[in-house]
Amino acid sequence: MARYTGSVCRLCRREGLKLYLKGDRCYTPKCAIDRRSYAPGQHGQGRKKVSEYGLQLREKQKARRIYGILESQFRRYFEKAERQPGITGENLLRLLERRLDNVIYRLGLGASRNEARQLVRHGHFTVNGRRVNIPSYLVKPGDVIAVRDQSKESPRIKELLERAADRTPPAWLEYEADQARARVAALPARDQIDAPVQEHLIVELYSR
């Protein structure tokens, strides 16, 4: 599937906040938004009034960029969220959180969602004992995600496992550091999703 291949630091500057797309670099003084907190481009430092539509569009773009999803796939997630019972915006975020690449990132087994996506594609993880290399795979309560035994010998995986052992995952994920595996305890509640997104604006945008 096609992916954005430009500078991810520009995306953070465009949205006006850290999206943590570059992993460890985002926590250092080298982070682009710390050095230049205005939008990229010739008129990036200019001030302009943003319309209601503009606010809604920016919120959708922000969500897409946080989770690293292209427009067509994001739209499909929204349509699926609409068909589910409950609040559409919360359903949307819940679907995005359940992506396997996001779960790996939340567990600390990827410094960024992009790295987590690459590790999933390279087949380093299993779900319920079977290797899964599809980043968009949606986990469900009761699923067990584990690092493959062969992958534990990789220097990068070893480093990530050490870091994950010191990290507290979201409450909907139960991580056993000594076994290098996690269990999906429940679907994530809205207050367990720390994505800085106003999902109601996305719903308003797609409802136009």
UniProtKB/Swiss-Prot annotation:
Cellular component terms (Gene Ontology): small ribosomal subunit
InterPro entries: Ribosomal_uS4, Ribosomal_uS4_bac-type, Ribosomal_uS4_CS, Ribosomal_uS4_N, S4_RNA-bd, S4_RNA-bd_sf
Gene for this chain: rpsD
A Pfam family per the record: Ribosomal_S4
Record flagged with keyword Ribonucleoprotein: yes
HAMAP family from the UniProt entry: Ribosomal_uS4_B
Organism, as annotated: Pelotomaculum thermopropionicum (strain DSM 13744 / JCM 10971 / SI)
S4 RNA-binding domain segment(s): 98-161
Keywords linked to the UniProt accession: Ribonucleoprotein, Ribosomal protein, RNA-binding, rRNA-binding
Gene3D superfamilies: Ribosomal Protein S4 Delta 41, Chain A, domain 1, RNA-binding S4 domain
Summary of subunit composition and partner proteins: Part of the 30S ribosomal subunit. Contacts protein S5. The interaction surface between S4 and S5 is involved in control of translational fidelity.
Protein name, per record: Small ribosomal subunit protein uS4
SMART domains hit by this protein: Ribosomal_S4, S4
Role this protein plays: One of the primary rRNA binding proteins, it binds directly to 16S rRNA where it nucleates assembly of the body of the 30S subunit. With S5 and S12 plays an important role in translational accuracy.
The organism's place on the tree of life at top rank: Bacteria
Single GO MF descriptor: rRNA binding
GO biological process: ribosomal small subunit biogenesis; translation
Family: Belongs to the universal ribosomal protein uS4 family.
